């Protein structure tokens, strides 16, 4: 039997399933993940995000989220506007990494955003995440936008560099 991989915009039911998986996977310290789940569901319900999921034989194996409207509590200058979407939550379940599934999901997401009128996408990365920076550069994120900080629900503050690419 041949494997079936599909990409789609997640339903709230899909999101519940995926977030429960992430919380269980981070069971040693689920606090941030529980707060992020609540925010992700609210952002989707309020039309601020488009969550994209890749499913292999019905199992959610990878994801990415596009913020298409800024959160009123966040500084989205240069990151989100009428023609710019902010991409985040790039995750692939460990057994499926390096097999091209996320690349297919990414291409699907970019094409969907393009058809919705978006012309530019942005990403954020911590300066010390060298491998992620290389991956983003490979995907074309080479235009430096700005540096800022992000505060996690537990109070941890991280530095973030933001990059953009035209689509």
Predicted features and spans:
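Glycine-rich acyl-CoA binding loop
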Residues: 98-106
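Active-site acidic-Proline motif in GNAT/NAT acetyltransferases
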Residues: 93-95, 99, 128
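Conserved GNAT acetyl-CoA-binding A-motif
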Residues: 113-125
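Conserved beta-strand-loop-alpha-helix junction that forms the acyl-donor binding cleft
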Residues: 123-133, 150-154
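Conserved N-terminal entry element of GNAT/NAT acetyltransferase domains
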Residues: 1-17, 21, 167
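Conserved active-site alpha-helix within GNAT-family acetyltransferase domains
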Residues: 103, 128-145
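Acetyl-CoA-dependent GNAT
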Residues: 12-13, 23-89, 93-94, 106-108, ...
């Amino acid at each position: 039997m041949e494997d079936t991989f599909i990409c789609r915009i997640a339903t709230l039911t899909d999101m519940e399933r995926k977030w429960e998986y992430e919380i269980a996977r981070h069971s040693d310290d689920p606090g941030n993940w529980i707060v992020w789940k609540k925010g992700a569901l609210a952002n989707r319900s309020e039309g601020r995000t488009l969550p994209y999921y890749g499913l292999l034989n019905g199992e959610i194996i990878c994801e990415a989220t596009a913020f298409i409207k800024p959160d009123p509590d966040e500084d989205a200058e240069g990151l989100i506007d009428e023609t710019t979407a902010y991409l985040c939550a790039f995750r692939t379940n460990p057994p499926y990494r390096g097999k091209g599934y996320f690349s297919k999901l990414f291409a699907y997401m970019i094409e969907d955003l393009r058809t919705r009128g978006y012309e530019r996408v942005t990403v954020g990365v911590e300066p010390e995440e060298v491998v992620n920076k290389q991956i983003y550069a490979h995907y074309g994120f080479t235009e430096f936008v700005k540096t800022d900080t992000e505060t996690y629900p537990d109070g941890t503050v991280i530095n973030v560099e933001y990059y953009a690419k035209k689509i």
